[in-house]
Regions:
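Register position in tetratricopeptide repeats
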Residues: 9, 16-17, 50-51, 85, ...
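Canonical positions in the second alpha-helix
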Residues: 29-30, 63-64, 109-110, 143-147, ...
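Short coil turns that delineate tetratricopeptide repeat
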Residues: 1, 35, 69, 115, ...
Length: 206
């Protein structure tokens, strides 16, 4: 669509100059004129995130990421990369401030946009654990595990859950959760903890 190309060209100059407010205004008009222009959508999402409106950007990135037409494959990859980039940047800032409630609120923002957001569920769970809200971890972990599409990520969730049970001295539940850690970097630690918990339980019962 010729008009969309014109909007891309107009918005490109302020975007490259990091004048995201002006670029967003132009790209928003272009996206409204051509809602199937995923390249424009990605630029608009970036502008919103750079302006501090992460949720608005996330809505757009999720819209792009949901496209299954092969012609949008490159745009889908870029949208997913943008979600990861801006999520990690925001989390790093909040972690640096030890603002666990801020991280939880941020994850809730992401879940408001997409309740099946596996990354948001995991971020939220980790923040609950870091603030020592073990009851919150226990209440949320199964839901978080259910939306993970990767076995390694699911194992990470069960590792956090097992650690929460262990912190509350709920040994059988801790063993059960840690036994579900079957992939990723926490397998050895989970197995070691399970062995230790079983040994301690055996000593207590002898």
């Amino acid at each position: 669509m010729l008009m969309a190309k014109i909007y891309l060209m107009w918005g490109g100059k302020p975007f490259n100059e990091k004048n995201y407010a002006e670029a967003a205004e132009i790209f928003a008009k272009g996206y409204a004129a051509d809602p199937k222009n995923m390249e424009m959508a990605n630029f608009l999402g970036i502008c919103y995130c750079e302006l501090g409106d992460f949720q608005k950007g996330l809505v757009i990135f999720n819209e792009i990421a949901s496209q299954d037409n092969p012609k949008y494959a490159e745009d889908v990859v870029k949208a997913k990369e943008n979600i990861k980039l801006y999520t990690n940047n925001r989390i790093a800032k909040l972690q640096g401030e030890n603002d666990f409630d801020g991280i939880i609120a941020f994850a809730d923002e992401m879940l408001a946009v997409n309740p099946q957001d596996a990354l948001a569920q995991k971020i939220r769970l980790q923040a609950l654990f870091d603030k020592k809200d073990y009851a919150g971890v226990i209440a949320s972990a199964e839901e978080a595990a259910a939306v993970q599409i990767d076995e390694e990520e699911r194992s990470d969730v069960y590792f956090i859950l097992g650690a929460a049970y262990n912190a509350r001295t709920m040994t059988p539940q801790a063993i059960d959760a840690l036994s579900k850690v079957t992939a990723g970097t926490n397998v050895a630690a989970a197995q070691k903890t399970v062995a230790q918990l079983k040994e301690n339980a055996a000593k207590a019962n002898s």
